């Protein structure tokens, strides 16, 4: 559960309505894989991840980034029940994929940076603070199965 004020929730929702999930998802996941290269081990089936350019233009990275942000969008619609919303994904990432839950926090922070780049002055300190709360809540929900 994420505790947002009415203004924070409105800001998150308003900005998210402008997000191009295809573009931002691929960019966020790609940046995660470039900046934190050890995360690439979970995506060996994606083909060439040998250079930053290869990662950022990899169609499988873009497609999975879109899928990730689709799940994130679902979380935004259920901010009062993030653990329930992400229960199956938490189980999958814990039991089958064995993803270090710290990676969820890293991806959330990368997503905030990508949003800041895309929205510039519209991504005010208040909007950024609200998104930090949301990505922390999502990361916590995804890590829930690990506890």
Curated annotation (Swiss-Prot):
Pfam families named among the record's database cross-references: Globin
UniProt-listed SUPFAM superfamilies: Globin-like
Post-translational modification N6-acetyllysine, affected residues: 60, 83, 145
GO CC entries: blood microparticle; haptoglobin-hemoglobin complex; hemoglobin complex
Record PTM Phosphoserine, positions in chain: 45
Domain Globin: 3-147
Entry keyword set: Acetylation, Heme, Iron, Metal-binding, Oxygen transport, Phosphoprotein, S-nitrosylation, Transport
Record PTM Phosphothreonine, positions in chain: 13
Expression by tissue: Red blood cells.
Record GO biological process: hydrogen peroxide catabolic process
Modified residues (S-nitrosocysteine): 94
Top-level lineage group: Eukaryota
Gene Ontology molecular function: any one: oxygen binding
Alphabetical list of InterPro entries matching this protein: Globin, Globin-like_sf, Globin/Proto, Hemoglobin_b, Hemoglobin_oxygen_transport
Modified positions (N-acetylvaline) in chain numbering: 2
Positions annotated to bind heme b: 64, 93
Role of this protein: Involved in oxygen transport from the lung to the various peripheral tissues.
Assembly with partners or alone: Heterotetramer of two alpha chains and two beta chains.
Entry similarity comment: Belongs to the globin family.
Protein's name according to its UniProt entry: Hemoglobin subunit beta
Encoding gene per record: HBB
């Amino acid at each position: 559960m994420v505790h947002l004020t009415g203004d924070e929730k409105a800001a998150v929702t308003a900005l998210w309505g402008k997000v191009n999930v295809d573009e931002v998802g691929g960019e966020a996941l790609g940046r995660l894989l470039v900046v934190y290269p050890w995360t690439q081990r979970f995506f060996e089936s994606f083909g060439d991840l040998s250079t930053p350019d290869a990662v950022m233009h990899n169609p499988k990275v873009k497609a999975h980034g879109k899928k990730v942000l689709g799940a994130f969008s679902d979380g935004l619609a259920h901010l009062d029940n993030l653990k329930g919303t992400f229960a199956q994904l938490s189980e999958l990432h814990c039991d089958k994929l064995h993803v270090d839950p710290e990676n969820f926090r890293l991806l959330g922070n990368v997503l905030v940076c990508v949003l800041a780049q895309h929205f510039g002055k519209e991504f005010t300190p208040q909007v950024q603070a609200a998104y930090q709360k949301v990505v922390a809540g999502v990361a916590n929900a995804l890590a829930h199965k690990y506890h």
